């Protein structure tokens, strides 16, 4: 006799037992109860054909189902633990830098997906650094909390923030938003730098030197900035 035939019968017996307990609590509707009665007759016929006791088969079916559920629970638990252990928060900005109010002389605002990009177009010929606080999971940017653009003097001149009304964004969304902000700031001949932490997680591909690859114009700006610092 095929072992799959027996184990299938055992599982069917246990599942019928669960459905019967459900019906005993007067929770089943008419179609449910009708199927229950028909399945009971079917199980009795199969038990006779297989020469298997229904009560014994029900207990064996319970063990099979419990093993399956235990395995699924263990795998789900392992994935949950792995996710929690892999989740971490990275902070370029202090609490003061995150909470500080700022004003724009020539405000420009753009919405890209679920992210809002704001910048001051009055800023010219400045060296600007982008800093961000965000969460990372499995070495990928998961959620942007806040990104701000600072001048060397510490003034805030740009910002990217999630829109509360449109929750959820990907690392690609953040990358695109950063590109928009950089492009807007560079338009007025500002030199834009990106924090090392943000570079690592906002751009996943790397150049030959192991640094995250940036758009060509951004590469030129960063090269000039590096030369001036040496």
Curated annotation (Swiss-Prot):
Region annotated RNA-binding and homodimerization sits at: 1-73
Q: Where is this region: PABPN1-binding?
A: 223-230
Question: Is DNA damage among this UniProt entry's keywords?
Answer: no
Would you tell me the Gene Ontology cellular component terms? host cell cytoplasm; host cell nucleus
As annotated in the record, motif Nuclear export signal runs over 137-146
Motif, Nuclear localization signal: chain positions = 34-38
- Which GO MF terms are attached to this record? protein serine/threonine kinase inhibitor activity; RNA binding
List the residue ranges of the region (Disordered): 205-230
Q: How does it assemble?
A: Homodimer. Interacts with host TRIM25 (via coiled coil); this interaction specifically inhibits TRIM25 multimerization and TRIM25-mediated RIGI CARD ubiquitination. Interacts with human EIF2AK2/PKR, CPSF4, IVNS1ABP and PABPN1.
- Comment on protein domains: The dsRNA-binding region is required for suppression of RNA silencing.
- Descriptive protein name: Non-structural protein 1
Name its species.
Answer: Influenza A virus (strain A/Silky Chicken/Hong Kong/YU100/2002 H5N1 genotype X3)
Taxonomic lineage is: Viruses, Riboviria, Orthornavirae, Negarnaviricota, Polyploviricotina
């Amino acid at each position: 006799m095929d072992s799959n035939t027996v184990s299938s019968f055992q599982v069917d017996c246990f599942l019928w037992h669960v459905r019967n307990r459900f019906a005993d609590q007067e929770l089943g509707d008419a179609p449910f109860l009708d199927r229950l009665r028909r399945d009971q007759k079917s199980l009795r016929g199969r038990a006779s054909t297989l020469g298997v006791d229904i009560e014994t088969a029900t207990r064996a079916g319970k063990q099979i189902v419990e093993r399956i559920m235990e395995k699924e629970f263990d795998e789900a638990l392992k994935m949950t633990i792995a996710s929690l252990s892999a989740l971490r928060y990275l902070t370029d900005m202090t609490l003061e830098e995150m909470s500080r109010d700022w004003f724009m002389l020539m405000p420009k605002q753009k919405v890209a997906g679920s992210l809002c990009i704001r910048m001051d177009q009055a800023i010219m010929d400045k060296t600007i650094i982008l800093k961000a606080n965000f969460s990372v999971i499995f070495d990928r940017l998961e959620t942007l909390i806040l990104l701000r653009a600072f001048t060397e003097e510490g003034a805030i001149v740009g910002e990217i923030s999630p829109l509360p009304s449109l929750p959820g964004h990907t690392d690609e969304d953040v990358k695109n938003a950063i590109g928009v902000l950089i492009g807007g700031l560079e338009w007025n001949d500002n030199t834009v730098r990106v924090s090392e932490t943000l570079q690592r997680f906002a751009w996943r591909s790397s150049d030959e030197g192991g640094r995250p690859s940036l758009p060509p114009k951004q590469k030129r700006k960063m090269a000039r900035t590096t030369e001036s610092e040496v």
